Swiss-Prot record:
Complex and partners: Homotrimer.
Keywords on record: Acyltransferase, Amino-acid biosynthesis, Cytoplasm, Diaminopimelate biosynthesis, Lysine biosynthesis, Repeat, Transferase
Enzyme class of the recorded protein, top EC level: transferase
A Pfam family: THDPS_N_2
Gene Ontology cellular component list: cytoplasm
Name this protein carries in UniProt: 2,3,4,5-tetrahydropyridine-2,6-dicarboxylate N-succinyltransferase
Annotated substrate binding sites: R104, D141
One GO MF term attached to the UniProt entry: nucleotidyltransferase activity
Protein family (similarity comment): Belongs to the transferase hexapeptide repeat family.
Disulfide bonds listed in the record: none
Any coiled-coil regions, as ranges: none
PANTHER family assigned to the protein according to its UniProt record, in alphabetical order: 2,3,4,5-TETRAHYDROPYRIDINE-2,6-DICARBOXYLATE N-SUCCINYLTRANSFERASE, MOLYBDENUM COFACTOR GUANYLYLTRANSFERASE
InterPro entries according to UniProt: DapD_Trfase_Hexpep_rpt_fam, Hexapep, Hexapep_transf_CS, THP_succinylTrfase_dom1, THP_succinylTrfase_N_sf, Trimer_LpxA-like_sf
Length: 274
């Protein structure tokens, strides 16, 4: 994999000269291999090593190179046609393949090739972009979107209309990450490389980006870009320094451990006790 990484890095430096008609066959083959590795989960844009998330930028570069290498093509749909550079992940699947991978895909869910979908995952009519990683046992509910290179953990529930932001550029930016056993409430948006740590519960209609204040009402601490593990988060406001107005914030109303979360329903966790 190291040799492939180096070749992708070299090709990316010369990306301005690359077009579908001028690309070297070896470069095309390397990019296709990298996309295939993302598609099968053999490689992923980000992975947790020794408790820290590490981003493999060369895989993002491979995705960006694919847009320069591959030309638009007609993609057949059930009742229409599409025209794009990226084929659909399930275009060549048959019943045996779906059963083997133990996934449910409800029409008209759209998943681009180069994204990984783990076993026992349910995709309602939703959208998963290339480079994304959706781990085992996760539910992607109706009209939820998983952006490019986003990382979704095991046993996550992305409720209806949830938006998980994607990131390809700038290259230095990390992907949005939802760790294992999280619940993201309907119409919430988690973007700009925010990390929602394991076992957290995000209420309906919570919007979190890198500049969003995430206020822990028990400790008074303010976090940016990270929801601590086991947090129960709702929408709220915090007063301005002058005291004349309030500005939006995400409020951590309580913390729960896995044992409590297993015994208590999501609705109970979201009931605020002042």
């Amino acid at each position: 994999m190291e040799a492939l990484r180096q070749r992708i890095e070299t090709a990316f430096e010369a990306r301005a000269e690359i077009t579908p008609t001028t690309v070297e066959p070896s470069v095309r083959a390397d990019v296709e291999k990298a996309i295939a590795m993302l598609d099968t989960g053999e490689a992923r844009v980000a992975e947790k090593i020794d408790g820290q998330w590490n981003v493999h930028q060369w895989l993002k570069k491979a995705v960006l190179l694919s847009f320069r290498i591959f030309d638009n093509q007609v993609i057949d749909g059930a009742e229409t046609k599409f025209f794009d550079k990226v084929p659909m992940k399930f275009a060549d699947y048959d019943e045996a393949r779906f059963k083997q991978e133990a996934i449910r895909v409800v029409p008209p869910a759209a998943v681009r090739k180069g994204s990984f979908i783990g076993k026992n995952t349910v995709l309602m009519p939703s959208y998963v972009n290339l480079g994304a990683y959706v781990d085992e046992g996760t539910m992607v509910d109706t009209w939820a979107t998983v952006g490019s290179c986003a990382q979704i953990g095991k046993n996550v529930h992305l409720s209806g209309g949830v938006g998980i932001g994607g990131v390809l550029e700038p290259l230095q930016a990390g992907p949005t990450i939802i760790e294992d056993n999280c619940f993201i409430g309907a119409r919430s948006e988690i973007v700009e490389g925010v990390v929602v740590e394991e076992g957290s519960v995000i209420s309906m209609g919570v919007y979190i980006g890198q500049s969003t204040r995430i206020y822990d009402r028990e400790t008074g601490e303010i976090h940016y870009g990270r929801v601590p593990a086991g947090s129960v988060v709702v929408s709220g406001t915090l007063p301005s320094q002058c005291g004349k107005y309030n500005l939006y914030a995400a409020i951590i109303v309580k913390k729960v451990d896995a044992k409590t979360r297993g015994k208590v329903g999501i609705n109970e966790l979201l009931r605020i006790v002042d």
